[in-house]
Amino acid sequence: MERNNHLLLEIRELPQTEAVAFIRSYHYSKVLPRLIKYYLGFYADEQLLGVVTLGWGTQPLQTIKKIFPKHDLVTASYLEIGKMCFLPSENHNGYFGSLALSTLAKWLRENTGCLFLYTLADGIMGKCGYVYQAANFRYLGCFTTSVYRCMATGEKIHPRSAGQLLKENAALEGVQKKCW
């Protein structure tokens, strides 16, 4: 548990269904990564205030090798923040994001063999991860990538996610194929 002047924060593993429901209620992007190892909830006074997913992107080994090309690290050496979201009351209050990340770092040390915590920090949305930098994450730069934009919602979708989403939407709508 982590304490500041405002909250005593505790992390607990959540059932996938509960974590996904929270994310779909409060995160702007409803798409979740496929490789999720942990669904974690941030609690204060038994109230769920936020959720984070930890796992890996689509190429876990290539990611760690690209970041640390001269080291002999493997996928188990790191975890990636896939989604992190909080109740609206905790956003922009000046401390909750940093408190959550501090609590998460402590949880990782106590519960995993993870050496590094990594995130792309909503780079697809043009963000550079201010909350992560404020919590002493090291900014390693940016890279360009292609994205699709859903015309109905305005959501940006990575091309790797688009194919699966189109298949799922086609099945839901009872049609053979959906296209952008």
Feature map (PLM): residue ranges:
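Conserved beta-hairpin
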Residues: I23, I36-W56
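A short, polar/charged loop/turn motif at coil->beta-strand junctions and beta-hairpin connectors
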Residues: N5, T17, L48, L73-T75
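Short amphipathic alpha-helix that is part of the acyltransferase structural core
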Residues: M1-L35
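Acyl-donor binding region in acyl/amide transferases
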Residues: E13, G55-W180
